[in-house]
Amino acid sequence: GNMASKTDSATAHLAEFAVQAGWQVLSFDLPEHGDRKGRELPCTMPQCVEDTRKIWAYAHEHWQTVGLFGVSMGAYIALAATANEPPAFAWLLSPTVAMGRMIEGMMRRDGITPEALKKAGRIQTAVGQVYWWADYTFVALHPARTTCKTAILYGAKDDLTGLSDMQAFVKENDCELTVSGVSAHWFHTNDDLAVFDAWLKNQTARVAG
C-alpha cells in the first residue's frame, strides 16, 4: 500500500498463515517504499506494474500454483500487472478498486486540474503529495478488474474507497466481500488484526482444503 512496506503487520500476518499452510511467500517493496526508498525509480503506476510483472514472471517460473495478496493501491497494481496471467486466487485487503475516482478526488481537494497535470507531467503539493500524469492516464485506461476467485476484506470506515464503489466492484467481478465494522482503510490496530487473522484463517483453510 501507499507508504507501506513488505514488513508491515498485514504482510507479516499473511506470511505466517501461508507458511503454516505449507506455502512459500514472495513479498517486495514498490519504488520509493521500504527498502527501495531513496532510489532513482519513481513510484508511478506504469513503473509499479512493470516491477510487479517481473516478480509475477519469477513466481510462475518456480511454482505451478501462484496466489495473490495485495493491500490498498498495491492490490490495484497487482490486478493490473496480472491481468493477462491471472492468479489461482486473490486475497485483497482494503483494495482501491476505484483508483481513478480516488485520484480525481484528491486532485480536486488540492486544486489541481487535469490540464495542469498534463502540462507539468508531475506536480508535488506543499505537503508532499505527488501527482503524475502517467498515473492519471494509466488508471483511466486500466480500471480494476479480476477474473480469478477473489476474496476481499474491507473496513466499513474506509475513507478512500466508498462502500458503493466496493459493492459495485464485487458485483461486477463476482468477488466475496467481508466487511469489518471496526476497521478503516488501514488495518493496524489489535482489533483490526484480529479480524484480519480470522479472515486469513478462513481463506487459508478454504484454499488448502
Stretches found by the model and what they are:
Residues 15-37:
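Conserved alpha/beta-hydrolase
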Residues 70-78:
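Gly/Ala-rich beta-loop-alpha elbow adjacent to hydrolase catalytic centers
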Residues 18, 81-82:
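Aromatic pocket-lining residues of Rossmann-like dinucleotide-binding sites
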Residues 33-62:
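Catalytic nucleophile-loop/oxyanion-hole region of alpha/beta-hydrolase
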Residues 3-15, 164:
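The serine-hydrolase catalytic nucleophile loop
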Residues 3, 30-35, 97, 184-185:
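Alpha/beta-hydrolase active-site loop signature
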Residues 68-70, 93:
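Short beta-strand immediately N-terminal to the catalytic nucleophile in serine-hydrolase-like folds
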Residues 85-168, 172-179, 183-209:
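The alpha/beta-hydrolase serine catalytic core
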